[in-house]
Amino acid sequence: NNPFEPEIERYYQLKFKAEIDGIPYRCMFDALRVDYKNKTIQPIDVKTSYKPTYNFYKSFIEWNYAYQCRLYARILKLNIEKDEYFKDFKILPYKDIVISKSNMIPLVWDCDFTFAEGILYLGKNNQIKLEAPWEVGKELWYYLSTGATVHMGINIESSNDLRTWINKME
């Protein structure tokens, strides 16, 4: 923390829990920058990479980091809404600070879709599909809680209709 900015505190490795659509989640932020004067909370994640930091946007898609920033921000929001002191604070879009051994130049990347709901389509031709993390969580919870070994909705005891499944394709 900076003595020249007494209204700003940085907190590290804070853990939170929340339930979304009946499914329990938990998270741990690398850092939260809390500005008490302006009533803002800045979630920050530190990423290390063997790739150049200027290529982080590719790793962001490859490793599905959108799930983390969207889910963690939602968990944080659900927690501060219940807190009498923090309920009026605004959560700022996620920041990823990326460092690489290859060039040792840390870069900061902003995630402007931190609070987006539903499915996101990104890329020049909207070819990158990012599911809502809580929707992916529902499917994961289904597998974990039922021991299922096939996709939700697939019938292993009788036939499945090809047209129905093909029509779900995007």
Language-model region placement:
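Catalytic cores of nuclease domains that cleave nucleic-acid phosphodiester backbones
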Residues: 1-53
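Short helix/strand-bridging catalytic loops that position acidic/His residues to coordinate divalent metals
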Residues: 49-63
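Metal-dependent nuclease catalytic regions and adjoining charged, substrate-binding loops involved
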Residues: 59-66, 71-170
